Amino acid sequence: MTLALNQLQTLQAHGMHTSAVPLADGDSVVIQQIVRVVPSRRIVCRALWRGQAVFAKIFLGTRANEYAERDKRGVMHLLAAHIPTPTLLLDAELKEVNGRILLLASVDDSDNAESLYQTSDAAKRLQLSLSLVEVLAMHHRAGILQTDLYFKNFLVKDDKVYTIDGDGIRNYAALSDAQMVNNLGVLISKLDVLEEEAWLKTLLEKYRTLNPQVVVDFNQVKALSKNHRTSAASSYADKKVFRICTDIEVQTDAQRFFAFARLFSTLALPQCAADYDALITQSVLLKSGNTCTVAHAQISDTEMVIKRYNVKSLGHFFGRMWRQTRAAASWSNAHRLQQLGISTPKPIALFEQRIFGLRGKAYFLSEYIEAPDVAAYFAHERGSLERAATIKQLVQLFYRLYLLRLSHGDTKASNIKIQQGMPMLIDLDSMKQHNIPFYAAKAHARDLRRFMQNWKDDTSLYNAFVKSFKVVYADHAPLKQADILSD
């Protein structure tokens, strides 16, 4: 396998000039694929060493030894506790650059638990969740706490679960009940919020069976899960995607702020406002107004939607130059929804024109989705089963938003697309994460009322939605608040 050019350039930017990285002892490791980059600190790769497939962790910078030792120590704690984890094969220094490398055995034909969860049916997802709870109970019995608890830090092969990423592993003589229950809450928070609603009792029963001495309260774990889920999504969407990180590259100066997803790093994206304006002019206009301009554009083989938020007047400029732009809100909320498992077009880039650091015009780029909006979808004749399934998916989308205390702000039909029977939210600049239940409920009722207005002239469809809302929502209070149901 030949290393892709952009990945070779990543190695070169960190002082390694070839995919065959030389080690201080004269050996070498051939990098085949870069999996993750923490700039100037860590590169995680698939590699070959002495003809054997391995997982390589390259630690760089002044704290390379500290981070390598912490990761190695975590692996040794797992091995000592007989918790399945890839074997540590080599700990060595790099030759050409100040750094350390850890080589771990590759678990061939394994699946990352996160991708497995996302691609499996409900029955397999439940079984995977039970397996992860079982592994977590095993951790806790051994005095081990995984402080970076994500599904992606587990591998699954033939129903066997491997714990990976020693960096987040901490070992204690004994864990308190509070530590274990909080850690369990973190794991539960990684589930789809609807599946947590359905499975939490079963998952907690599994944990109690394996760790009976721990007092596990249903409501406590549910509250912890909600807090961890909201906190993690907000930390990522409100902070992390506005700085350089594994997923995002950021370039900024007095004239611009430019953030783009590394997933689209090979695209020749415009570098200034004038070039974005020119691209919009050359593209298919979807909307042209005083507030914003929307165009369907294409760069290389990638179709995208560019949304430009205009500065309407000098007074408008002075009123908003200190505040977050609506483009930035769209960028943030697109990543928030991705973190929470709610479908939305992939965010590509955020570009803000700056005038001595003050915000001017702003642009949000997202992937273009060829799919009808919800009104156009139902305007076509649909089979009864397909129609009922799509209605249920839409109602479940709103129930997810309710449980997550998220409001969209404008749930007209054109802001919800239907792709292969599944709803997808667009136009996210008014979306809000609510921390206070009263305001969350009030905003959700507004979203529900606006959504149901789309069907006021179609009694059959309106009534079908009402029927589905009654079944899906365990609590009918929000439906009554939105006047969908009466007291």
Put a short name on every predicted segment:
Residues 151, 168, 370, 413, ...:
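Short, glycine/acidic-enriched loop or turn micro-motifs at the edges of active sites
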Residues 144-151, 406-413:
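Catalytic-loop of the protein kinase fold
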